């Protein structure tokens, strides 16, 4: 009889763990979607020294030491 209770307890624990992991993965997915919607696509203007380009792109084409060269960077 103790084996049946232990088996039921193990099943309940596993089911609860799966639910918690599914909620965390959904939360991560929503954050990733929000980031992708707010990132700057390829060819878009970006601010120097800022990480606003979409994943896999970099803000290039400007001199970070020249204060007059603002707004000329592009996500590439």
UniProtKB/Swiss-Prot annotation:
GO CC field: extracellular region
Source species of the chain: Scolopendra mutilans
Keyword terms, alphabetized: Calcium channel impairing toxin, Disulfide bond, Ion channel impairing toxin, Neurotoxin, Secreted, Signal, Toxin, Voltage-gated calcium channel impairing toxin
Name of protein: Omega-scoloptoxin(13)-Ssm2a
UniProt GO molecular function: calcium channel regulator activity; toxin activity
Family statement: Belongs to the scoloptoxin-13 family.
Protein localization: Secreted
Function field: Inhibits voltage-gated calcium channel (Cav) currents in DRG neurons (IC(50)=1590 nM).
Higher taxonomy: Eukaryota, Metazoa, Ecdysozoa, Arthropoda, Myriapoda
Post-translational modification: Contains 4 disulfide bonds.
Tissue expression summary: Expressed by the venom gland.
Taxonomic superkingdom: Eukaryota
Signal peptide annotation: 1-22
């Amino acid at each position: 009889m103790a084996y049946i209770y232990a088996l039921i307890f193990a099943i309940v624990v596993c089911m609860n763990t799966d639910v918690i992991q599914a909620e965390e993965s959904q939360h991560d997915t929503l954050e990733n979607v929000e980031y992708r919607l707010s990132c700057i696509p390829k060819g878009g203007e970006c601010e120097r020294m800022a990480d606003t380009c979409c994943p896999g792109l970099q803000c290039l084409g400007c001199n970070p030491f020249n204060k007059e060269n603002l707004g000329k960077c592009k996500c590439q």
